[in-house]
């Protein structure tokens, strides 16, 4: 065999070995992991559940100079529109399974509505939920309650602040609402209606304990009956603040900045300051509906605002 022929055969043999490796390149999956996280608050198991994300024009929504908003977001490696988490929180007290907020369901498009799938991935079923506590009746918090006119959580009692129920479930308010606001009323009514008809909706009329270890506190401003929920066990505390904050990159440094979704901007700002001052002073764990998933962390007073310290990823012990 001549030398050139030996060289050609060797090259062909080498290519035969390499070729399968090249052809076996795996396709990209391009999907996110199931959106749930787990931690213990004393003896209570808390599972943040992500309903998905939605892109929002925060430079237009936040009540400050748009250029300032864009610059601040940029410094935090964010852009506009800003991808914003929509989080709910599942609380297992050992005797009750409680869900705080339900995500958007089908009311906000295909990037949301993942709560039930993620709840199941977390090891639970909708029929196991005993109680649902709504922070407020905006569509991205109540939309997951119903699907095609039927209750998604067949065995659950739903609770929300009375002022929110009186406002959002009022036909008179729907009738006189501006055209661009009617959808919020209609979404709330459609979402709550199966539970109202079944006698499974109960308004929260005053601050107090709803089940052992979970307390409701009125924090109006974002909506008339916006409510926060405090989980306590063995000296540990988690405060679920709902929509007291939307954009940590902006509103932690400047807590006076409000958002266009607030029904009463002055009251919303005051509620944020009150609860955040307390959380920073006491070192309380905070959970937010629109803080980047899992939406959990601590507040440290810094200048005229706060520093957000996200929770450290930990094993459940």
Report each predicted region and the residues it spans.
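Metallo-beta-lactamase
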Residues: 26, 113, 120-124, 128, ...
